[in-house]
Amino acid sequence: MNRNLWTSPQYKIRKKVFALANQYWIEDGRGTVLGYTRQKMLRLREDIRIYADESMVQELFVIHQEQVLDAWGTFAVVDTARNVCVGKIRRNIMSSFLADEYFLLDPFGQTIGRVYEESGRGLLRKYIPMGGLVPERVRVEVLGQQVAEIRQQFRVIGDEWDVDCARIPPQLDRRVLLAGMILMGMVERERDGN
């Protein structure tokens, strides 16, 4: 795998909603597709596989739920080629009533940061009729410093998230951040019934 795929200062995650399953594309700042996944339906444990493209031949990394039937659990992000965990993501169940928040963990399970939705927007999105039309604005902190911002843009048959990660430190593998964004999109889909 070309490790330079995961050093771009800009990414875009595109989500298209289809009848049976959502599809997600990861693109760099120039619009080149770097990854693709399709959400599986009726699963006991999340096992999200990110491929190089829609042919789903070359697997790049996996987002693997560590506990069965645990929607609030910890997810390992595994580099498929090396079979190595590059980091983990854990949902903060206590904040999920106000706004989405995930903790970013190193491969050993130590918290190094968080991805969180602005609480005012989160409240609007979750509890106000038609609140889902309020675009998400998500912030990323690593080691106590804000290092990235993610902005949602609505499209006719899906959404897009622009990820500005030029200031991400080397302690955080960008695949972990991108995996967190895909998880947030999938969890939101289940919550909203989309």
Model-based region annotation:
Residues 1-194:
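Intrinsically disordered, low-complexity proline/glycine-rich segments
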